[in-house]
């Protein structure tokens, strides 16, 4: 027994209620899980429950309220009540009646990334200048960093240290794919297959039938005189490099190819060198399965048809059209020379002054300028203006966007190989020598993707493995390797991401002003590298040496 004294009032705890016992005022007993205080002396044989003249509830327990494991007890306003356990993944929230209920987690619109800019893919040989972004879980688009020429699409030119929502207008169905070129224009294919464009438009590359810049996205698919009017857009092809004079191509679901913008070297494929301010269908080619553009201004264009035929046109000063000459072509011409003879082509890739074609047997063919760097990987440093076979068992090809050309190839066995410019050992040559032969990068045989960053000799590489880990090597003066410092690496090192899993990687920036992006499988995006114009989202513009979360 115990006595609780509250000044002039003393309660004596008598334990569990017993019907034969005599109780006096201030005696406390437990009964059916609750506690009661006796109100009348000499109370015998009167149970506490429902006898308010003899007993008063002293402290309510949970007996009669809850009986199942995992139930939660709450005050319903007049009594205690039990809430059954929720299901896995549910969270406790407040219902419309003000009482606790189980519900689905309330994820705020756009709080997670689900897809990076298409510049992260091998389809776009381009590295955006001090800016990046992606598509969110609500299908909106967020971007940050340098905002020259309204490229962030938020209506002004202020650099942003945090992701801002691109200001699409009425009729926008949500983003499917987003592209930006080096420093001028942005493009988005919406979920309905319509094309939106914004930014600088001095060459008519926005496809809006004028040369007026756009501060926010405009629907180019609604231009009735445009060749993409009424069509479903599936891909946008932007040029690489840093030279301006912008051209763009658009691939539609029906296999037609369309072009707009600068045309000084016939890169629009329309039979002349006249600029186009709206999209015009490219003649000759049909049922196009893949298309690419080379460098800005001095642009070569390529298309692969579903039947395996390869076409090229445009600038040819470096022999990148693959016809054995350096003469430009203003209209698409099928290429069957050299080792392409009799081959069915499945994909095409291009670099600064060279091109690569993958045939349906996994053989890789290359052509273009090769002196100094050996970027064709053909075993020598001689130019090859007609295609030569350079590798077998190839699954994918990765090139850098401008000078000091190098190339990585991922083979069907999951290994990664490098050739070309050896600056900072990005090509895999530890001594930093240029290499005309492909050499294996020592990171095993589970590579799923690679990327090459930097221009002006500041090359570096990332490689994503099947288990979600990332290796990095090459130039690291601003921490873009994400390994915690600014020391260059001549051999691949593991990026410290603890036990987390990366599902996609990207590189952006030019020269030594580079950044890397790491998209995790939970939708979080982290970046490392250069901080100018808030390229890495750092408010103070400092470089960041380890992957740092992008704060929304």
Region spans (language model):
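Glycine-centered loop/turn motifs
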Residues: 26, 45, 68-70, 88-89, ...
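Disulfide-stabilized extracellular beta-strand modules
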Residues: 31-42, 414, 523
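Short, surface-exposed beta-strand/turn "edge" patches of beta-sheet domains
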Residues: 40-48, 536-537
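Extracellular/surface recognition and adhesion modules
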Residues: 26-29, 38, 72-73, 92, ...
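Eukaryote-biased RCC1-like beta-propeller repeat architecture
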Residues: 105-552
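Short, intrinsically disordered N-terminal pre-domain segments
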Residues: 1-17
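Extracellular repetitive beta-rich solenoid segments
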Residues: 3, 21-33, 49, 53-107
């Amino acid at each position: 027994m115990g006595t609780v004294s509250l000044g002039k009032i003393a309660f004596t705890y008598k334990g569990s209620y017993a019907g034969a016992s005599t109780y006096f005022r201030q005696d406390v007993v437990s009964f059916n899980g609750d506690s009661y205080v006796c109100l009348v002396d000499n109370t015998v044989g009167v149970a506490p429950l429902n006898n308010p003249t003899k007993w008063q509830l002293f402290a309510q327990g949970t007996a009669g309220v809850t009986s199942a494991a995992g139930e939660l007890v709450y005050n319903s306003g007049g009594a205690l009540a039990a809430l059954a356990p929720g299901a896995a993944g549910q969270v406790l929230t407040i219902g419309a009646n003000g009482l606790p209920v189980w519900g689905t987690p309330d994820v705020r619109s756009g709080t997670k990334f689900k897809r990076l800019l298409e510049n992260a893919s091998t389809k776009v040989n381009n590295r955006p200048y001090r800016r990046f972004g992606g598509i969110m879980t609500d299908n909106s688009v967020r971007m940050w960093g340098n905002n020259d020429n309204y490229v962030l699409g938020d209506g002004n030119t202020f650099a942003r240290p945090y992701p801002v929502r691109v200001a699409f207008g009425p009729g926008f169905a949500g983003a499917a794919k987003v592209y930006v070129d080096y420093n001028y224009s942005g493009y988005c294919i919406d979920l309905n297959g319509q094309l939106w464009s914004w930014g600088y438009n001095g060459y008519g590359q926005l496809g809006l039938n004028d040369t007026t810049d756009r501060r926010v996205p405009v629907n180019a698919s609604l231009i009735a005189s445009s060749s993409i009017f009424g069509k479903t857009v599936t891909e946008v092809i932007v040029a690489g490099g840093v030279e301006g004079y912008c051209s763009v191509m658009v691939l539609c679901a029906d296999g037609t190819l369309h072009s707009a913008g600068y045309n000084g070297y016939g890169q629009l494929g329309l039979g002349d060198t006249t600029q186009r301010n709206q999209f015009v269908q490219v003649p000759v080619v049909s049922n196009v399965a893949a298309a690419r553009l080379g460098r800005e201004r001095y642009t070569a264009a390529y298309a692969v048809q579903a039947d395996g035929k390869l076409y090229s046109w445009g600038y040819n000063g470096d022999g990148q059209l693959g016809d054995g000459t350096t003469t430009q072509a203003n209209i698409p011409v099928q290429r069957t020379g050299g080792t392409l003879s009799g081959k069915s082509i499945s994909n095409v890739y291009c670099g600064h002054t060279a091109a690569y074609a993958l045939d349906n047997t996994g053989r890789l063919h290359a052509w273009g300028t090769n002196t100094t760097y050996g970027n064709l990987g053909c075993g020598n440093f001689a130019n090859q203006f007609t295609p030569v076979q350079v590798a077998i068992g190839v699954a994918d090809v990765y090139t850098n966007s401008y000078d000091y050309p190098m190339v990585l190839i991922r083979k069907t066995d999951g290994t990664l190989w490098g050739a070309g410019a050896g600056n900072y050992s990005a090509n895999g040559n530890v001594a930093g020598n240029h290499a005309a032969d492909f050499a294996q990068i020592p990171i095993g045989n589970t590579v799923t993707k690679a990327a090459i960053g930097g221009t002006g000799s500041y090359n570096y590489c990332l490689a994503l493995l099947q288990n979600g880990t990332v290796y990095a090597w090459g130039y690291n003066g601003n921490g873009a390797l994400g390994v915690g410092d600014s020391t260059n690496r001549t051999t691949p090192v593991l990026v410290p991401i603890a036990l987390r899993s990366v599902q996609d990687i990207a590189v952006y920036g030019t020269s030594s002003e580079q950044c890397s992006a790491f998209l995790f499988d939970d939708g979080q995006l982290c970046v490392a590298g250069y901080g100018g114009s808030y390229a890495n989202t750092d408010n103070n513009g400092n470089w960041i040496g380890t992957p740092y979360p992008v704060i929304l």
